[in-house]
């Protein structure tokens, strides 16, 4: 107070505000934080009162002049690590919520966190309070040790992977090294506040990255108590969010995604991510994985690593699949079967039996000429090769992913990973329902416990609900089948009688028309059922009262995957393994519910229909999913910002801008994995019928990566950084689907495609040595005597021919075993079963050999891990040794001499014994 300059300023300020001092005092105090008011002095005298007012006015001036994009407290020094928000509530439980918040925030301050509250009058809606949280150095170092966060102790001497010749070829897809490797490589060790000198601490404000800071704060928030209710201690931000005591809790983004930060804000990694990752013009570039991990945490980072690796592996499958498709395209015009079907002298002379009862007429085989050519695109010799190739590809994918995962564990310091504490934390819903407690064998503390007998009813309810919804899926599939059966006759009679459709009959047959409309209808039903089941599955999982967040996610994963499996794949299984297999024959057809005649396959086979079904469902799901992922958060955020459509940067503070973004939610990654694994099923389970499936998946994933990056960077709040060392239970699901895919593709080749019957004819029944496939079409069609039609199935119009043909291997009407399966049928069946056994054994043998030959952890990674452990131990040893020297107060020579004396004494004592 003795500084003359300061006294002069005080005098000037006092003259200006003397008349309004009381009013200014009241207004300024309402807008200052508790920490700011702590700078004030005792106001017993007028000069002191004026001095306090001066400080308040200066603090208010700083507040008003603070950049709206600032991520600091009003002092411009303390960084905001987390934000809580709540709405001014006038409901009857408002007082209870206010008491909870007061107790919670008081306890947060007791842990060492610093809080600053933004009044609702400063918010855009005039209703929302914001609580800004800062973790000071002492809090960070304490909880970094508790969480076992690894921090750098020395720059690594292990060189990064060297450039290979292929690296120069891939130059255009590479990112700048400053983006790909934003930080140098370090040897790391678990942080210890008692060994701070060991760590490379250049600046305390930037030593802990923002992801580690928000992880530490969230750890405190999730354990901070807020009172005792019903005789139980209540704690955790999640419980307060569930009760709407707080409306949201989130860490701040670094800044705007469309421009770099201005001082004093730190480097804007969000902007860097948007520029180099979240733009669609960078679709061909690699991902900045280290930067993603640094900003969002390992759990989100590993999802993008997996999606990127899966996409890279799809490239090889897509190339082979495209080659198989091109082979089918080039050989389409030279295919003997299609040539015979299209030949007026062969296919044009073959009268086929009606495809439905009474209303359908006889038809000539060459009317399916174009359809048979299309069928050859996917049903040719390359189908067998591609089915075997994909069985091997999926093994290579999973084995190389294990290697990639092991390398990732080393690069991201996850070698000694332990499950995230918050994932193992008890759910508030579980605690609320528990009436018993028992001793935890590990922690030796009493914890809530729910006996099994109290949960059994909920398990039964859960199982019954899942079974009911799966039954509903099957019922909907049967309904679509009934639709196909009922409209097939309508399409057939309509297309036969309408002369205007003559031009399209060659490629739009009743079978294809029914298949297209049925597949589209099935896709719509799938989306509707999926929408409702997502809500139902979340509800029944909550009813099971899972103990931890990890148990909740695992239970939900199982339910959702089982439903998705049945919902998306059931129609494909029907077309692949049931359609056309139990038709019967003319005069003795099989009927669904004794009313609708079973569907038949096209003379060219059922594979083209499976291809159609797979294409519509897979492509439709991917397009719909990407549109929904992009538009949904965009629309919600626009609605929240509708009051500030222009120049929102000036209207909103940084915390309010982030508050108005959509929350990614605790299950955000769950749905991303579910979508990817469902696509993986389409690519592997039925790929023999559609070699272009990997190409479609590749294109979708290239878009998916950028859509996910864009929405995370621009449309969602920043997520709390979480650790994960693998993709979790999804890896087991992928392994299960990989094994199942070998069987499904073997059965598709054997029973759905026409490859095996052709091979049997080629080697056993062909009589033409120069062109062995000549006569195959005639051989594959059996003969039926029209007079044998029952009255209720025969066409209403009489014809002058006496026989018709149908697809099967049966004796002709003039044989003593008429209409029974002939010997060729059994030969073909034996060949099909043999093929399945041989293919499965060959593929599984190759799979096991590859799994044995490819190590789970690459050799160079093993060496790097050993090197880092050795160097870490050495650095820790040297640190402790130097510390011991300092404590003993002796120099290095004296210390060495002291050690030698002690060693000599020990040897002497040993020799005397």
Swiss-Prot record:
List the Pfam families.
Answer: Anoct_dimer (PF16178), Anoctamin (PF04547)
Impact after mutating residue 804 to S: In LGMDR12; uncertain significance
Alphabetized UniProt keyword annotations: Cell membrane, Disease variant, Endoplasmic reticulum, Glycoprotein, Limb-girdle muscular dystrophy, Membrane, Osteogenesis imperfecta, Transmembrane, Transmembrane helix
Q: What is the effect of changing residue 618 to I?
A: In LGMDR12; uncertain significance
Q: What is the effect of changing residue 833 to K?
A: In LGMDR12; uncertain significance
Positions of glycan attachment: 335, 366, 380, 768, 778, 791
UniProt-reported outcome of changing residue 93 to E: In LGMDR12; uncertain significance
- Tissue specificity field: Highly expressed in brain, heart, kidney, lung, and skeletal muscle. Weakly expressed in bone marrow, fetal liver, placenta, spleen, thymus, osteoblasts and periodontal ligament cells.
Q: Does the keyword Endoplasmic reticulum apply?
A: yes
- Topology feature Extracellular, residues: 321-380, 484-511, 579-679, 754-834
> Impact of altering residue 513 to I?
In GDD; uncertain significance
**Segments passing through the bilayer:** 300-320, 381-401, 463-483, 512-532, 558-578, 680-700, 733-753, 835-855
Location relative to the cell: Endoplasmic reticulum membrane; Cell membrane
| Residue pairs linked by disulfide bridges in the UniProt entry | none
Look up and give the membrane topology term: Multi-pass membrane protein
Q: Report the disease annotation for this entry.
A: Gnathodiaphyseal dysplasia: Rare skeletal syndrome characterized by bone fragility, sclerosis of tubular bones, and cemento-osseous lesions of the jawbone. Patients experience frequent bone fractures caused by trivial accidents in childhood; however the fractures heal normally without bone deformity. The jaw lesions replace the tooth-bearing segments of the maxilla and mandible with fibrous connective tissues, including various amounts of cementum-like calcified mass, sometimes causing facial deformities. Muscular dystrophy, limb-girdle, autosomal recessive 12: An autosomal recessive degenerative myopathy characterized by proximal weakness, weakness of the hip and shoulder girdles and prominent asymmetrical quadriceps femoris and biceps brachii atrophy.
* Annotated family: Belongs to the anoctamin family.
Q: Please give the name of this protein.
A: Anoctamin-5
> Which organism is this protein's natural source?
Homo sapiens
Lineage summary: Eukaryota, Metazoa, Chordata, Craniata, Vertebrata
């Amino acid at each position: 107070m003795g500084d003359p300059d300061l006294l002069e300023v005080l005098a000037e300020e006092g003259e200006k505000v003397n008349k309004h001092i009381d009013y200014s005092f009241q207004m300024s105090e309402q807008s200052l934080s508790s920490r700011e008011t702590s700078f004030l002095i005792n106001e017993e005298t007028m000069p002191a009162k004026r001095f306090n007012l001066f400080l308040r006015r200066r603090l208010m001036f700083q507040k008003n002049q603070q950049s709206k994009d600032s991520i600091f407290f009003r002092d411009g020094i303390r960084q905001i690590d987390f934000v809580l928000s709540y709405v001014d509530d006038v409901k009857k439980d408002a007082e209870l919520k206010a008491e909870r918040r007061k107790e919670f925030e008081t306890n947060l301050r007791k842990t060492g966190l610093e809080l600053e509250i933004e009044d609702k009058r400063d918010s855009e809606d005039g209703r929302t309070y914001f609580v800004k949280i800062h973790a000071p150095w002492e809090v960070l170092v304490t909880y970094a040790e508790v969480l076992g966060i690894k921090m750098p102790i020395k720059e690594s001497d292990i060189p990064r992977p060297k450039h290979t010749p292929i690296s120069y070829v891939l130059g255009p897809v590479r990112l700048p090294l400053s983006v790909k490797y934003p930080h140098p490589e370090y040897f790391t060790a678990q942080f210890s506040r008692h060994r701070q000198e060991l760590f490379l601490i250049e600046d305390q404000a930037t030593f802990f990255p923002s992801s580690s800071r928000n992880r530490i704060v969230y750890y405190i928030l999730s354990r901070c108590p807020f009172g005792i209710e019903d005789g139980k201690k209540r704690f955790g931000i999640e419980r307060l969010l569930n009760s709407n005591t707080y409306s949201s809790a989130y860490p701040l983004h670094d800044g705007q995604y469309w421009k770099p930060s201005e001082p004093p804000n730190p480097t804007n990694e969000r902007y860097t991510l948007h520029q180099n990752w979240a733009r669609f013009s960078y679709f061909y570039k690699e991902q900045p994985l280290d930067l993603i991990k640094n900003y969002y945490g390992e759990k989100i980072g590993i999802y993008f690593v997996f999606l990127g690796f899966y996409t890279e592996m799809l490239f090889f499958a897509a190339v082979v699949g495209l080659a198989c498709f091109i082979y089918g395209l080039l050989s389409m015009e030279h295919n003997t079967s299609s040539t015979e079907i299209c030949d007026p002298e062969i296919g044009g002379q073959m009268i086929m039996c009606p495809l439905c009862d009474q209303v359908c007429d006889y038809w000539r085989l060459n009317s399916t000429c174009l359809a048979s050519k299309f069928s050859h695109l996917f049903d040719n010799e390359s189908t067998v090769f591609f089915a075997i190739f994909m069985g091997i590809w999926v093994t290579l994918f999973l084995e190389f992913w294990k290697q990639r995962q092991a390398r990732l564990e080393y690069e991201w310091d996850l070698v000694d990973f332990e499950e995230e504490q918050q994932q193992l934390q008890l759910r508030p819903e579980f605690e609320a329902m528990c009436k018993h407690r028992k001793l935890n064998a590990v922690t030796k503390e009493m914890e809530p416990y729910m006996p099994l007998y109290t949960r059994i009813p909920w398990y039964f309810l859960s199982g019954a609900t899942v079974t009911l919804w799966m039954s509903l899926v099957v019922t909907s599939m049967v309904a679509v089948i009934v639709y196909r059966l009922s409209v097939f006759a309508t399409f057939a009679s309509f297309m036969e009688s309408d002369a205007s459709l003559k031009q399209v009959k060659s490629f739009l047959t009743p079978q294809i028309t029914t298949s297209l409309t049925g597949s589209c209808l099935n896709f719509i039903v799938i989306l509707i059922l999926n929408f409702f089941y997502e809500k139902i599955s979340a509800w029944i999982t909550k009813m099971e009262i899972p103990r931890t967040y990890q148990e909740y996610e695992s239970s939900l994963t199982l339910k959702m995957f089982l439903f998705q499996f049945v919902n998306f794949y059931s129609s494909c299984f029907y077309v692949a393994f049931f359609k056309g297999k139990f038709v019967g024959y003319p005069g003795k057809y099989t009927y669904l519910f004794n009313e609708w005649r079973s569907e038949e396959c096209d003379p060219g086979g059922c594979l083209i229909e499976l291809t159609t079904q797979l294409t519509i469902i897979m492509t439709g799901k991917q397009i719909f999913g990407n549109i929904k992922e992009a538009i949904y958060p965009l629309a919600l955020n626009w609605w929240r910002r509708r009051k500030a459509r222009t120049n929102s940067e000036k209207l909103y503070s940084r915390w309010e801008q982030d508050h108005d973004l959509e929350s990614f939610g605790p299950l955000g990654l769950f749905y991303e994995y579910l979508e990817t694994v469902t696509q993986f099923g389409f690519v592997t389970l039925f790929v023999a019928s559609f070699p272009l499936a990997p190409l479609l998946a590749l294109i979708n994933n290239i878009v998916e990566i950028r859509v996910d990056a864009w929405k995370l960077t621009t449309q969602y709040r920043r997520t709390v950084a979480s650790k994960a060392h693998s993709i979790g239970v999804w890896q087991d699901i992928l392994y299960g689907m990989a094994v199942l895919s070998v069987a499904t593709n073997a059965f598709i080749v054997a029973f759905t495609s026409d490859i095996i019957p052709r091979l049997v004819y080629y080697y056993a029944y062909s009589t033409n040595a120069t062109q062995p496939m000549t006569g195959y079409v005639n051989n594959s069609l059996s003969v039926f005597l029209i007079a044998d039609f029952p009255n209720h199935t025969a066409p209403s119009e009489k014809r002058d021919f006496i026989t018709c043909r149908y697809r099967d291997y049966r004796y002709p009407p003039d044989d003593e075993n008429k209409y029974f399966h002939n010997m060729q049928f059994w030969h073909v069946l034996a060949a099909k079963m043999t093929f399945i056994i041989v293919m499965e054994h060959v593929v599984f043998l190759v799979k096991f050999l590859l799994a044995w030959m490819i190590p789970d952890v690459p050799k160079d990674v093993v060496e790097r891990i050993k090197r880092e452990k050795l160097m870490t131990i050495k650095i820790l040893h040297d640190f402790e040794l130097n510390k011991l020297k300092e404590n003993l107060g002796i120099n290095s020579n004296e210390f060495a001499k002291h050690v030698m004396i002690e060693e000599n004494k020990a040897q002497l004592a040993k020799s005397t014994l």
